[in-house]
Amino acid sequence: KWWDFGRKQGGLFVFNPTVTVDNSWWYRGTADAMYQNINFLKKRHEPYVIITSGDCIYKLDYNKVLDYHIEKKADITVVCKDMAPGEDVSRYGVVRMNEDSKIVEFEEKPMVSKSNTVSTGIYIVRRRQLIEMLERSADEGRWDFVTDILIRYKNMKRIYGYKMKEYWSNIASVDSYYQ
């Protein structure tokens, strides 16, 4: 009940990697983590899925992002954050958007970047399209959500960036965790 926020339907679901007799693979990447839980997605009726990272701390109203996603008629919305000028963005996915906020370039952990706008690892995706992209990716043995879905489909799908102004911090390293 707590994780569903007292709802009868929907809510928050956390998926942990599970090795079983039927499934001997640990998650091979971010797309595989979703693919291994695809039956859950197929049984749901909600039109949208919010995907979040487990190594970030942030304050964000998902309803505002969902409204933006619907307004843009987006296939995928990437929540982005402008980092301070001069801040090292080489450990993030870096995005460039056009004047309509459509993502025109996505570089994963670039050595030199043309932008200081980073992906926060938070996405809203149409559920049916997510299932379709995950199945295609798995059929081809591709397991990374950013490389094999976002970057691959950026010119074929309507992928928009939503710039968050609220607090966001990545805690993927011990140092960043203690900060």
Residue ranges and their predicted role:
Residues K1-Y68, M97:
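Conserved N-terminal catalytic core of the sugar/cofactor nucleotidyltransferase
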Residues F15-P17, V79, Y162-M164:
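Conserved beta-strand termini and adjacent loop/short-helix elements that scaffold enzyme active sites
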Residues M34-N37, V95, L130, L150:
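Structural element of the ATP-grasp superfamily
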Residues Q36, K81-M111:
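Rossmann-like NAD(P)H-binding beta-loop-alpha module
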Residues K42, E46, I50, I57, ...:
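Catalytic-core segments of class I nucleotidyltransferases/pyrophosphorylases
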Residues L60-S90:
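Conserved donor-nucleotide/metal-binding helix-loop-beta segment in metal-dependent transferases, i.e.
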Residues V78, V94, I122-I124:
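Conserved hydrophobic/aromatic beta-strand scaffold that supports enzyme active sites
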